[in-house]
Amino acid sequence: ESAWDAPRALSLPGLAEHLGLVRSAIHTPLKELEASGLISTRSAHVIGGGPRRRTVVHLTDSGRQRAELLSEEELPEKSQSLAIGPIPNQIQIRGREGELDTLLEKLLAGGNLQLTGLPGIGKTSLTRSVAELLMERGFKIRWATCNSDSDAFAIGSMCLGKESPRDAVAIASAVSGKKTALIIDEAQELHPRHLSAVHSLLSACAETSTGVLAAVRAPSPFGTLPGFEEIRIQGLDTSDAVELLPKSIGSESAEQVAEALGGHPLALHLWSPDEDIPEKGQAVQEFVQSTVLRRLTNEGLGTLDELSLSPLPLSVEELFVAEGISELDDSAVLRWMHSLVEPHHLIRNVRRATVDEEIARDLHSKAAEIWSTREGLRARRIEAHHRLNSGDELDTEWLAENVATISLEDSAAAAVLIDDAIQINDDENLRLTAIDLAFERGEPDVASEHIDSVSDSPQKLLRKARLARQHGDLQEAEKLEQSALDSLSPADAVRAKIASLVRAHDDRLPGQPTQVQSSQIGEVNLSRLPKTDLASASLALDLLRHAVAVESGSVETLANVRSSLVAQMGEDHPRLALIDL
C-alpha cells in the first residue's frame, strides 16, 4: 500500500471498468466503504497511466476481514483459465441475459456465429462473458483480437499460442478440437489486404466441429459468411441501462438519459451527471462529437488525436503528447490492452471524421518526424503509416526498402503498407515490391493481380516466370525467364539468374527433390558482375552448391565447397557450424 506504483485495476477508472459502471456511479459506494473503514484511498503513480499521480483504492485490515467472511456462495465462481490468446479481462455486464443464453446454447452445439452491432454496443464484453461461461463448462477458448496488421497467420498464431501454419485449412485443423471454441474479436479492424484470406480461414473453420464466434462492427466487411448465423445486438433495455448510471441522479433522470442514448452502453459510460440530459433520438456519434469531445481540454484532445491517428495501440511511454492520458482515462475514452492503449473505436472513428484533413495531414507529418528518430521495426512501421497519410511527396525508394525490412519480422504489416502506398502512388517499383512480397507470403493470386498492373519489362517477365513455377508450369517458367535474361544488361542478367536458381531450390514442397543441377550453378558467369558484387554473388552460389550437393550425396563437391566457404567466411563463422550438422 505504500508502493510508489499501483496497478490500474486499483484506480477509479479501473474499478469502474471492471464493474461495468460509469465512473460517477462508484463515488458514493466508495465514500460509504471508506467511512466504514473498509477501504482507504491515496494518490499514487498508476502503472502505464502517465506521469500524474491518481487516486487508488486499498482494502483496510477490516476490509480484508470482511472480504474473508464472505461465503463461497457469495463469491463469483471462478473458472479454470482455459484461454489461449489475448483474451481481455472480464467485466460485469448487465441486461444481456437473453443474448448470453442464445450465444452459449449455439456455441455449445458447435454453431458458427457472426455477432454484429454498432461500435461501443458491447460486443467484446458480451463475447468475453460467453467465453467465461464456456470455460466454466470445461471448454478451451482460442481467442484472437484483430487489428489492421492481422492476417490469417497472425490470427492462427494468437489462437494457438505459438507459430501457426500458413494455409487456411491447416490453421482451421490446428485450432479445432473437442470442447473448443474459436473467438475472433474486432474483425472490422482487418485491412482490406487481408480480408479475403481471413474470410477463407473463417470458411475453413466453419467446416470443422468447433464452434466459431466472430465479433464485428456492423456492417460486417465479410457481408454474409457462409455457414454462419448472424446475431445482431441492440442497445440495453431502459430498465437495464439505468443500472449503469449513478443512483444520485434519480430514477426519472436516469430513464431519460438511458432512453435518449438508446441504451448504448459506451455512450452511457461517457455521459456525465454534470451535463444536460441528451436530446432524445440524438445519434450516438453526434453525442460523442457535441458533448464528449467538446468537454476535453486541449491536452486531452492532443493525446486523443495522437492515439486516433496511430495505426496501432500505443504504450503511454510511446506517446509524445502524453499529458492528456489521465483526463482521457477518467472520461472513459480509452480501452486498455495490458500496457497498450487506444481510444474506444466509436470515439476514434468520430474524431478521425471530425478533424480537418489539412490538420490531420500536419499531425501525421509531425508524428512521422518523431517516429523517425526511434529505433526498431515497430517504429519504422508506424513512421511509414504517418508518412503515407501526411500528404508529403512519397519517397518510394525509402518505403520499398523499409517494407522489405519490416517484412522480415511482420510480413502482414509490410503487405498493408505497400498496399496503402499503391493506393496513394501507383508506382511501378512499389508494384514490383508488392509482387515479391506476395510471393514470399505464398499468395500467388495476389502476385498475379499486381503483375497484370505492371507494364511490360524484363522485371515483369521474371515475376511471371516465378508465378508459372509456383503453378507447376516449369517449361513456361524457363521460357519466360530466358526471355527476361536476354533483355537485361549482362550484370542484371547474372543477378537475376542467381536469384532464380536460389528460388528454384527453395520454392518447393517439403520432401520434393531440388530441380537445380550443379551444372546450372557452374554456368553462371560471375565475370559479368562489377567487382563490388563478386563476393556476395560467389558466397550465394557456394551456399546453393552446398545445399544441392547435400541432396545428391556428392562428398567430393561438399568438401570442395566447404573449403571455399571457409576462405570466404572464416572457420569460426556460425553458419559453418550449421552446415556441418
Identify what each model region corresponds to.
Residues L75-L103:
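Conserved adenine-nucleotide phosphate-binding loops and their immediately adjacent elements
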Residues T116-I141, A218-P219, E323-S326:
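P-loop NTPase Walker A phosphate-binding motif
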Residues R96-E99, S125, S196-Q256, A260-L270:
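Alpha-helical sensor/transducer elements of the RecA-like P-loop NTPase core
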Residues A174-L195:
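Conserved P-loop NTPase "ATPase switch" module shared by AAA+ and STAND
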Residues R361-S457:
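Extended alpha-helical scaffolding segments used for macromolecular assembly and cargo binding
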Residues K247-S290, N298-G302, L309-L312, V321, ...:
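Amphipathic alpha-helical "lid/sensor" segments that cap RecA-like P-loop NTPase cores
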Residues V56-D61, A67, L126, V284-Q285, ...:
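Short capping/hinge segments at domain boundaries that bridge a core fold to an adjacent linker or tail
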Residues R128, M135-K179:
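Conserved phosphate-binding/catalytic loops and adjacent sensor/switch elements of nucleotide-binding enzymes
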